[in-house]
A protein has these predicted regions:
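C-terminal motif of bacterial Sec signal peptides marking the signal peptidase cleavage site
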Residues: 13-14
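Kelch-like beta-propeller repeat domains
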Residues: 19-320
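Sec-dependent signal peptide recognition
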Residues: 2-8
Length: 320
């Protein structure tokens, strides 16, 4: 494992109100918000890939990767491959989630959109060494391309799709096994790939637009577009320093390294980052820092081949 520590790269969200590039995003000054990115390593132990996950659990950071799972107890400086295997199989279609001090695997997916095998298995690990199959016959909705989230001590699912259609419903569960549909025909319509985060006491559903909710069922639109005039997708979303952060955005079909930040889901500022443009990254908040790795770049007329990443970066708030 190679370690490459850059000097501190100080990145402020704005010192002026000038637009960044041609994005329509304005930079504004946060009174006490000065952030720094630090590269921990050029190449982590896991293979270069995208659409996998990072977790923070019990003061340890975990990488859940298609080829296995790794953990670090020293802020990403050293990693150990775990005996814990990949249970849900295709991480591009389904997610793991931390719930009640354990990691849950919701379903099993093998194949692609057109031809696949889906099983409503529910997996759980508490010791981070082996999986317990809670059931092979849950009523987990048969779908993919959704991102489960935790709210009010329950697991939640919004939207997603199967091989025929997208959905506009919301489900929740106390245990991951028994799922109850709370509402259909949500006001934002059928969609998949939305990310839901909790900022303070409200949920924010993020796609190209932004909706908020205090109860997970009733939703209010905050903005029609995160970046007016652009289509934004493929990002990782998380909450850090009482703000929503979007990392690894695809903007109008072009991958970007600019991070988008908002304190209310309505107004968004851009912050340039030193890592290469990419989408499909893995990110988490751990010990009051943002950790990110993975992702892919390419698929455009001027860069037809995809390039994948496994470098590891950390963002923290600079002490004054």
């Amino acid at each position: 494992m190679r370690y490459h520590l850059l000097g501190w790269l100080v990145l402020c969200i704005g010192c002026s109100s000038a637009p960044i590039g041609n994005t329509g995003i304005q930079t504004n000054t946060y009174d006490s918000s000065v952030y720094v990115w630090q590269k921990i390593m050029d190449s982590a132990q896991w293979k270069k890939n995208y659409n996998f996950q990072l977790f923070s659990i019990r003061d340890t950071i975990w990488t859940f990767h298609p080829d296995g799972n790794w953990y670090s107890a020293d802020d990403g400086q050293h990693w150990v491959k775990s005996l814990l295997p990949n249970s849900i199989h295709n991480l591009a279609f389904l997610d793991y989630i931390v719930f009640k001090d354990a990691v849950y695997g919701l379903g099993y997916f093998e194949g692609n959109i057109e031809t696949h095998l889906f099983k409503p298995h529910i997996y759980r690990t508490r010791d981070m060494q082996s999986w317990e199959v809670l059931t092979e016959q849950s009523n987990l909705p048969k779908r993919f391309f959704y991102h489960p989230f935790v709210f009010k001590d329950k697991l939640w699912i919004i939207g997603g799709e199967d091989e025929r259609q997208q959905f506009a419903d919301v489900w929740n569960s106390d245990d991951g096994i028994h799922w109850v549909k709370q509402l259909d025909q949500l006001p934002f319509g059928k969609r998949s790939g939305s990310v839901v985060v909790q900022l303070k006491h409200k949920l924010y559903l993020l796609n190209n637009d932004v909706w908020s909710s205090a109860d997970g069922v009733n939703w209010v639109k905050e903005t029609d577009a995160i970046v007016p005039g652009e289509q934004i997708f493929g990002y990782a979303a998380l909450v850090y320093d009482e703000k929503i952060w979007l990392l690894g955005c695809n903007r109008n079909g072009q991958f970007s390294s600019q991070v988008l930040v908002s304190s209310d889901g309505k107004k968004w500022e851009g912050m340039d980052a030193p890592w290469s443009p990419r989408g499909g990254i893995a990110a988490t908040v751990h010990r009051n820092k943002i950790f990110m790795t993975g992702g892919k770049y390419g698929g455009t007329p001027d860069h037809t081949e995809f390039m994948y990443s496994n470098d590891l970066w950390v963002l923290s708030k600079k002490n004054k």
